[in-house]
């Protein structure tokens, strides 16, 4: 993301009333992009229900800087791996990770994404870190919303 170079702020007082501040749109957009996470959800299994619950109004994670999901990896910087990853899905996940712009982070959501879970057989991958580097692990089956928010705040 770009650095915030210059901010031009002017206080305008229409008719002598209370003032309000205006700023350049580009500067405000650069600041928002610098301090917001744009996520790409890779949802494959039952943890997807808890992911939807965390992104709902009760545990609104947009208040912590994680904005609406982007469904293009080129526009996102946080990859949420939610659920079990099979051997057939592994190349797709790797390609999505490679398409993401720098800087990029990966969050493994749940036990299956972290270490394979109880699906320990030849068709599943025993953890996201066997395919791509993983930065944050949120344990649980499914993880509690509070644990997800704690992982997001790291």
What kind of feature is each model-predicted range?
Residues 48-50, 84-88, 113-115, 143-145:
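Gly/Ser/Thr-rich loops at beta-strand to alpha-helix junctions
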Residues 74-76, 82:
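Internal helical hairpin/lid segments
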Residues 2, 63, 81, 85-90, ...:
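Metallocofactor- and cofactor-centric catalytic cores in central/energy metabolism, strongly enriched
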Residues 1-72, 100-104, 122-124, 130-137, ...:
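Iron-sulfur (Fe-S) cluster-binding modules
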Residues 111-115, 127-130:
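A mid-sequence interfacial segment
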Residues 77-78, 105:
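Structural motif
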């Amino acid at each position: 993301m770009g650095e915030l170079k210059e901010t031009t702020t002017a206080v305008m007082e229409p008719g002598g009333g209370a003032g309000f501040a205006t700023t350049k749109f580009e500067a405000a957009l650069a600041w928002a992009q610098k301090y917001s996470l744009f996520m790409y959800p890779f949802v494959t299994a039952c943890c997807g229900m808890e992911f939807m619950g965390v992104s709902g109004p009760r545990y609104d994670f947009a208040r912590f800087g994680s904005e609406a999901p982007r469904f293009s990896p080129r526009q996102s910087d946080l990859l949420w791996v939610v659920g079990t990853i099979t051997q057939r899905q592994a190349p797709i996940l790797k390609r999505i990770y490679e398409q993401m712009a720098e800087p990029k982070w990966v969050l493994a959501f749940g036990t299956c994404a972290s270490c394979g879970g109880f699906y320990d057989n030849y068709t599943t991958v025993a953890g996201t870190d066997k395919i791509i580097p993983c930065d944050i692990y949120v344990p649980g089956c499914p993880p509690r919303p509070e644990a997800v928010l704690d992982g997001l705040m790291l």
